[in-house]
């Protein structure tokens, strides 16, 4: 995983720089999202990674699927990825691009895992608390995880706040072993 990030980051930074220069962050975000989805689609992935297809055929197919999202810069980007055998990195490139975009917009993404569904009020309270803690706007991704037994686990970047019953039980078990 770390290797993918290391290889994908320069591509994401280059695209981010170009998108910022052109004032087209949202358009690039949309295009990268579509390109990543193509590579993640098993049927399309088989076609674009099949050595029987020429680089021009793969590029044409991807641009055809992209439709109006594909401009000359996107075309050159796809060509560069094909030339360097990096098409499979598109999902990670898109993720790194979104991180850069969120940083520039002063937004932090938070993954919230909860044993039970959270109410809108609880989500708003979490958003407020995290926003104060990080000094940024917070974009929540809330998921249910019954394995937590109760409580929540919040991940923001490398920070993990584990206020779950499972986390507390694991901490107690670890302290009893020592």
Curated annotation (Swiss-Prot):
It is a peripheral membrane protein. This is ATP synthase subunit delta. Keywords: ATP synthesis, Cell inner membrane, Cell membrane, CF(1), Hydrogen ion transport, Ion transport, Membrane, Transport. The lineage of its organism: Bacteria, Pseudomonadati, Pseudomonadota, Betaproteobacteria, Neisseriales. It comes from the Bacteria. Gene3D superfamilies: N-terminal domain of the delta subunit of the F1F0-ATP synthase. F-type ATPases have 2 components, F(1) - the catalytic core - and F(0) - the membrane proton channel. F(1) has five subunits: alpha(3), beta(3), gamma(1), delta(1), epsilon(1). F(0) has three main subunits: a(1), b(2) and c(10-14). The alpha and beta chains form an alternating ring which encloses part of the gamma chain. F(1) is attached to F(0) by a central stalk formed by the gamma and epsilon chains, while a peripheral stalk is formed by the delta and b chains. Its main location: membrane. One of its GO terms (cellular component) is plasma membrane. HAMAP family: ATP_synth_delta_bact. GO terms for molecular function: proton-transporting ATP synthase activity, rotational mechanism. It is found in: Cell inner membrane. F(1)F(0) ATP synthase produces ATP from ADP in the presence of a proton or sodium gradient. F-type ATPases consist of two structural domains, F(1) containing the extramembraneous catalytic core and F(0) containing the membrane proton channel, linked together by a central stalk and a peripheral stalk. During catalysis, ATP synthesis in the catalytic domain of F(1) is coupled via a rotary mechanism of the central stalk subunits to proton translocation. Belongs to the ATPase delta chain family. It comes from Chromobacterium violaceum (strain ATCC 12472 / DSM 30191 / JCM 1249 / CCUG 213 / NBRC 12614 / NCIMB 9131 / NCTC 9757 / MK). Pfam families: OSCP (PF00213).
């Amino acid at each position: 995983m770390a290797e993918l990030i290391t290889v994908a980051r320069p591509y994401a930074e280059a695209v981010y720089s170009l998108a910022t220069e052109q004032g087209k962050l949202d358009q690039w975000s949309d295009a990268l999202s579509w390109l990543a989805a193509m590579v993640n689609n098993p049927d399309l992935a088989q076609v674009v990674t099949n050595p029987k297809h020429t680089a021009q055929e793969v590029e044409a197919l991807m641009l055809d699927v992209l439709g109006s999202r594909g401009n000359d810069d996107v075309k050159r980007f796809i060509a560069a990825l094909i030339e360097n055998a990096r098409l499979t990195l598109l999902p990670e490139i898109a993720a790194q691009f979104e991180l850069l975009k969120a940083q520039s917009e002063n937004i932090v993404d938070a993954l919230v895992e909860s044993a039970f569904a959270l109410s809108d009020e609880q989500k708003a309270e979490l958003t407020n608390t995290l926003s104060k803690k990080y000094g940024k706007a917070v974009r929540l991704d809330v998921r249910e995880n019954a394995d937590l037994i109760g409580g929540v686990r919040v991940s923001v970047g490398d920070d993990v706040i584990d206020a779950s019953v499972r986390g507390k039980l694991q901490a107690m078990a670890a302290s009893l072993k020592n």
